[in-house]
């Protein structure tokens, strides 16, 4: 058959099959996929090479040293009924601890909100306090049997496509974090990383950007029986941060 207009996924370790199918189906380009790489045998076989990169993940070494530069989101606790004029709400009780970590910096706390959901009235900051050690918010002077919520900023500590591949494709490797390109330090790091990537991938003819900066919003719960709390496959929930709000 003719050659051209067809891109074939390939993978290191499957050279013979990849090149056989490329010839049989008339591929003009071979590409990698999330979690796969192409061997020299494939990249030097005379085909165009598409290389996949996600700018904001797979930088765990840098992310571990700059954990205040991770992407964030707002989380809101489920409404909880008060049985007296005081109430304590565990912020992460309903959320997946492998995905989120509370951002309890002084700058972040300025944007936390506690609401009486029965009356839809915001609780004054003087009427609640945060316990860092317990990860909980305690309310006082509230109305018994009204329901209350806390919205707070949380760091994302497990990138969602990495989560998806672990749970769907049974990956068994380090959880990938995602970094936020809004920060000047992150931008400087990423520009250097991109320059190095281009220099070390001379066989690449097309770069396939995937997931870009913020995408694929998954918010998982702590209960295995109710893991998927919210999903949106094209969203901006994860663009928020203290610098963005400022």
Where do the model's predicted regions map?
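Glycan-processing catalytic domains of CAZymes
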Residues: 1-246
């Amino acid at each position: 058959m003719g050659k051209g207009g067809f891109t074939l996924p390939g993978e290191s370790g499957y050279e013979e099959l990849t090149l056989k199918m490329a010839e049989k189906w008339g591929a003009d380009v071979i590409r990698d996929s999330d979690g796969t790489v192409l061997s020299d045998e494939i990249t030097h076989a005379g085909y165009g090479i598409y290389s996949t990169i996600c700018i904001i993940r797979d930088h765990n070494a840098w992310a571990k040293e700059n954990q205040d530069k991770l992407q964030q989101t707002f989380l809101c606790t489920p409404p909880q009924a008060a049985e007296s004029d005081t109430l304590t709400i565990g912020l992460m009780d309903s959320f997946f601890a492998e995905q989120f970590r509370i951002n309890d910096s002084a700058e972040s706390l300025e944007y936390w909100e506690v609401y009486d959901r029965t009356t839809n009235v915001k609780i004054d900051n003087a009427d609640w306090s945060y316990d860092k050690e317990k990860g909980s918010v305690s309310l006082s002077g509230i109305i018994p049997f009204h329901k209350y919520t806390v919205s707070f900023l949380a760091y994302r500590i497990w990138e969602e496509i990495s989560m998806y591949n672990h749970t769907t494709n049974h990956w068994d490797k380090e959880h990938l974090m995602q970094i936020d390109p809004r920060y000047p330090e992150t931008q400087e790091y990423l520009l250097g990383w991109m320059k190095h990537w281009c220099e070390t991938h001379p066989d690449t003819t097309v770069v396939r950007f995937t997931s870009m900066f913020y995408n694929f919003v998954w918010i998982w719960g702590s209960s295995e029986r109710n893991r998927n709390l919210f999903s949106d496959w094209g969203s901006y929930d994860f663009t928020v941060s203290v610098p963005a709000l400022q």
